[in-house]
Amino acid sequence: MPADEQIERLMNEYGDAILRMCYLYLKDYQLAEDAAQETFIKAMNAYDKFDHKSSEKTWITRIAINCSKNIIRTQWFRNSRNNYEDYMQSETHNPVEACLEKNSVTSAIMKLNTNDRKLIILYYYQELAIKEIALIIGRSENTTIQRLNRARRKLKEILVEVGYGER
């Protein structure tokens, strides 16, 4: 299959999930779109090197996480985060972002540290198996289970604080 058809298939199959994961990682819709686009460009350029040791979804998710991390590392991102907080306080921000920010669960996930947030996103939003998550984060399955359980407990604490209570 030619590279352009391959990338189109990847975008159709994983595009929405990758964009959602990048948004949850970056907390900014425009940056998430940039990260998702960069993910598919990198996937297209590296597809012939993909050795199929893991699933395609695991591979492209790893690329998306790395693209998101690269954006986070930039000084521009750090500066724009301060501006973003001010922007979110205004009445003219993106309605998609506003909807996601108002969602209590999404907001609670955003309050988790990066590692815990990554685990929750990969497990619940990307619907990856523990084995696939372990490959992505470079840990054993048992360690991944322990970390996921710890992230769940932290998320539960945050949700209880905002009024969800014991359920």
Where are these regions (language model features)?
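A short, charge-rich alpha-helical start-of-domain segment used by transcription regulators
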Residues: M1-R20, E33
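Pre-recognition alpha-helix immediately N-terminal to the DNA-recognition helix
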Residues: Q6, A17, S104-S107, R117-K118
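Short, small-hydrophobic-rich alpha-helical interface motif
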Residues: I18, C22, A32-A43, I63, ...
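C-terminal flanking helix
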Residues: L19, F40, N113, R117, ...
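Σ70-family region 2.3-2.4 aromatic/basic alpha-helix that recognizes the −10 promoter
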Residues: F40-M44, S54-F77, R152
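DNA-recognition helix of helix-turn-helix
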Residues: I65, I137-E161
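Internal acidic/polar
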Residues: N70, R78-M110, A129
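A short pre-motif secondary-structure segment
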Residues: L119-Y123
